[in-house]
């Protein structure tokens, strides 16, 4: 970890990571005292770095917005650096995407997320994760209608109806949700949309048995642009209420985070496991979650993969 004074000299090197080969940059800002011009220059330099930037902070908020992670102790810095080192490709793409998307319109931000996801689909970390998966299932669910809709007056109820598959975002579930959310976008007479799920949990995220099926990452990006539910949901957040329970993993929280209102039962918990798979949140989470809880917390949840209970 370098100190705040040394950083003023480091910024003479445009891309610091290229010269030292480090997987992340950790800086102790606890005693930083920069002029306004120095804050601007250092912030711009930090955001240009292709590796995650961790800041050890006390009450000093001068450089806060330029950081990818904020730590309170040196031990926390070491922990974050360890997680990043285990998945350096995915961690780097994650922070690059969340840096950019915060300043973009939602639909443009979703495109950036999909491009980052596609990049990692062709990467060594994801390939390594795939090689460790047991191919014991053909995936999906045998339920013919994984998404059910019922309208009462101006309210539309949408039910994730694949409990045997823990309501995983399979291709059929994805397409069903896109159809439902698209209907809402086209029908102004639908004033309220309530989304809930059958079974023991809201959604366990992507259907792992379908991961790696598409070998053409450019085509996979094209399909996401056409089919991902987030693009329809994100345009009308105020009309949506999500009722969550049990596991909300990956897409199981990435999509609800777009909604204007979320309620959760006491057994609800959240996780973003994608970085450990060599990927980034790809169902809209790099866009929806930072807008809800901030970029630092989103990056932390994604890189550590920690389980967050509803009490937290």
Where are these regions (language model features)?
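Ordered, small/hydrophobic-rich secondary-structure cores
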Residues: 1-103
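Glycine- (often His-adjacent) and acidic-residue-rich active-site loop
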Residues: 61, 197-231
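Short, active-site-adjacent cap segments at secondary-structure transitions
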Residues: 96, 200-203, 249
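Crotonase-fold acyl-CoA enzyme core
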Residues: 55-84, 234-312
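Catalytic-core regions built around general acid/base machinery
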Residues: 41-46, 180, 225-236
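Crotonase-superfamily enoyl-CoA hydratase/isomerase domain that binds
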Residues: 43-44, 76-137, 285-312
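Conserved CoA-thioester-binding segment of acyl-CoA-metabolizing enzymes
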Residues: 1-45, 129-196
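Hydrophobic/aromatic residues within transmembrane alpha-helices
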Residues: 94, 195, 255-256
